[in-house]
């Protein structure tokens, strides 16, 4: 079994290479693992990836509402540097709900608050969540209620408001691409539609690494259900093809395990693309 003490890369390599689907793949431990020089991940329901630079930390995603403080505590077990920037890969609550804890941590330490970055469609999502708060609470309880009751993951909109008041608004948004340069590191943020219309992913060309958010999640791609807003399986598949064309050799997802090695990346991203293309094609036939 792939228990929390096993390094996530070791678990992923064994699963992909053997074809044996050991569980769990999404380990909600709030523990930090060092993945590479100056790179770590906190495994939560939605992970937080952290890049250490000479100018501070760059994070991808903030974790969920209930566990933002746990995620921050894990980050602080590794580095006391200020958090320079935090990228929202998209606006789902399990990715943005913990952002208030990051802002509070900066205030407690006397640091400048992180700069929050997102795709330009994300603020409209936040506004929609506020306008339709009760409805979002209801549909997420239907989707995740059983999960929440078993594991207390806090992903079902269980507070008085679906989007908490302390969730940080993005300070800067982009449309297609944005270059993030921090402390000698360059990450290109790219937009593609997939599970959401506001999805961003990060491309670290120097290390051939992609921070993929929910484009990869170690489950069948969540291409939609009747109670959710439109999702984009054809564009999602195209994003997988784009990553492969760029030469990605490392995939760092928001759910599940890191995928390291070009052959493994080709297998996983190729399978996701083919599954989505098949799903869309057969549905439209």
Label the model's feature ranges.
Residues 24-25, 55, 66-116:
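Active-site metal-binding motif and surrounding structural segment of the metallo-beta-lactamase
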Residues 97-101, 126-132, 221-224, 262-266:
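Short acidic, glycine/serine/threonine-rich loops at helix termini
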Residues 1-21, 134-141, 146-154, 159, ...:
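Accessory terminal helices/loops
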Residues 57, 66, 124-191, 235-240, 244, ...:
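Metallo-beta-lactamase
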Residues 60-62, 82-92, 117-119, 211-213, ...:
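Active-site neighborhood of phospho(di)ester-bond hydrolases with catalytic His/Asp-centered motifs
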Residues 25-79, 201-213:
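Conserved beta-strand hairpin/beta-sheet module of binuclear metal-dependent hydrolase folds
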Residues 33-34, 42-44, 172-173, 181-182, ...:
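A short catalytic or substrate-binding loop motif that flags glycine-/basic-rich loops and adjacent residues
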